[in-house]
Amino acid sequence: MGQEDQEVLIRGGKATSTSAESLNNNNEQPYEQSSINQGFCKNYGTLSPPSPALTADNLTYSWYNLDVFGAVHQPGSSWKQLVNRVKGVFCNERHIPAPRKHLLKNDSGVAYPGELLAVMGSSGAGKTTLLNASAFRSSKGVQISPSTIRMLNGHPVDAKEMQARCAYVQQDDLFIGSLTAREHLIFQAMVRMPRHMTQKQKVQRVDQVIQDLSLGKCQNTLIGVPGRVKGLSGGERKRLAFASEALTDPPLLICDEPTSGLDSFMAHSVVQVLKKLSQKGKTVILTIHQPSSELFELFDKILLMAEGRVAFLGTPGEAVDFFSYIGATCPTNYTPADFYVQVLAVVPGREVESRDRVAKICDNFAVGKVSREMEQNFQKLVKSNGFGKEDENEYTYKASWFMQFRAVLWRSWLSVLKEPLLVKVRLLQTTMVAVLIGLIFLGQQLTQVGVMNINGAIFLFLTNMTFQNSFATITVFTTELPVFMRETRSRLYRCDTYFLGKTIAELPLFLVVPFLFTAIAYPLIGLRPGVDHFFTALALVTLVANVSTSFGYLISCACSSTSMALSVGPPVIIPFLLFGGFFLNSGSVPVYFKWLSYLSWFRYANEGLLINQWADVKPGEITCTLSNTTCPSSGEVILETLNFSASDLPFDFIGLALLIVGFRISAYIALTMRARRKE
């Protein structure tokens, strides 16, 4: 529909039926000298529920005086706010509050059991903001007026009560792509369903939901990662998102743009699923941008929004009468949904006239029949108490701590086994690098040159383990952060259960990789023979692999994206590398950097491996073949040259173990802080 196609001809307070020809008449000047009948909405729109019976499992959801503000981002606004706060503290100047945008303007509405309510409007009308505020899911920086009331069956509710009874399907589908649809639902059942249910009962519920949402054919298909791993189609992913929420059989379902990115066929199948849920007595609310005529017929009620205000609430049939009465009859060659959205849209280049028209429509609706009935009902229904203690959630989380840990551990272990880049490629990479280093330093002898080469090969052990494991951890962990943020905000599991489950599931891989590397490179290079020497070296290399893994966790938890983590990692690792004793003698470290050397795992591991290699090398074992070169007479001389002592080997093990614990605790704290900032 073009710009002229949006014109609604209302002149002299009389409604004029708008035909397709008049809408395309370029000579008309729309909205000029127009007025709106102040009583046009008296008899249009409905508030009556389809069923009078209401229980805790059959909910009427209503919101009253929903007033929402959002921060306006301005260039340099953070710096300006800081300057204003400093002036307020030290200069006794009044702090100027940041500008705010009025997102929702005293909106009220109601959705009943057994009906599908579609929230419609143009982009920026406030549809998603309405849903987020209704479901207590508003993002950081959004402020909701204290006068706002959200009710279930006439009882005011808080975020905890709403979470217990409402399922919220967001626009973006976030999954672990290496799982199948069935595995994903089993995990969701483990953390969502009540703790008194057995595992068998949860699996039976998963089977029932798979059948109800027609996921049987794809239940054993990988979910996949768009653009990387082929998996479920867009419609199947959306139905899987519904299935995740439907496991607990919630009486209220809120969906944000469920048809976004889908073709007309897939969109129709998704909305049909929601329609079936509403026919089972569920209260279903969804936002939709541009529904087809077939989709529009599935809606029981529509709520039209414009400029953050409610412009209409009622059935699609009543909407036809509503807009006809104000002189905006829908032409026969347009779908009603498109026409209503266009009528309530702000036309580029004609913002003043458009906003004036929208304001008049919304103002008149606010004093009409539906708004008056809602006002009266809210005054009658609001009660001081909620659902009562007997109906409140007994636990903050549905699953126990152990069940959360078990579920996360199971899912993380499946991800490790199924992720090709995490297992196959890493094992192949480790084997190739170990063979390459072994062949380059093949069969080193105890000579002057051999001593230098062995020391270099040992340091390569450390650098390879560090960069291979830290960067692998950064890549893997950050990709799950969006899923983690959403699931923790939905109170599916705690931060500590996720962190423990994730790290323990990946631990076997970080034990196999150093063993494989050491088993190949150690004998090829010809390092100190003996079972005790081999296992001492293996223990040190394994500790290095896990220190670097822990450091990778810390970087990934502290950074907001994979690209940022990959950019931050190398510059932070380099200082630790310099204090390893290979480039800079440990006795030459400046006093002001001494503290940093104690945080370097390169220092502890390099010292430990060199002690393991040279501590028991007696005088005469090193062959001196070059007379013009200083030749170390024994292993003790080599260690003294590097400022290492054989007695420090136990402290090297302790230092590496403490770094593992310290980095992981720091990573957990960073992860917890990130999760709390999102709440």
From Swiss-Prot:
Q: Where in the cell is it found?
A: Membrane
Record-linked SMART domains: AAA
Residues glycosylated per entry: 628, 643
User: Which residue ranges does the record annotate as region Disordered?
Assistant: 1-34
Which PANTHER family does UniProt cross-reference here? ABC TRANSPORTER G FAMILY MEMBER 28, PROTEIN WHITE
Write down the NCBIfam families for this protein, in alphabetical order: 3a01204 (TIGR00955)
| The protein, known as | Protein white
Query: Which species does the entry assign this protein to?
Result: Ceratitis capitata
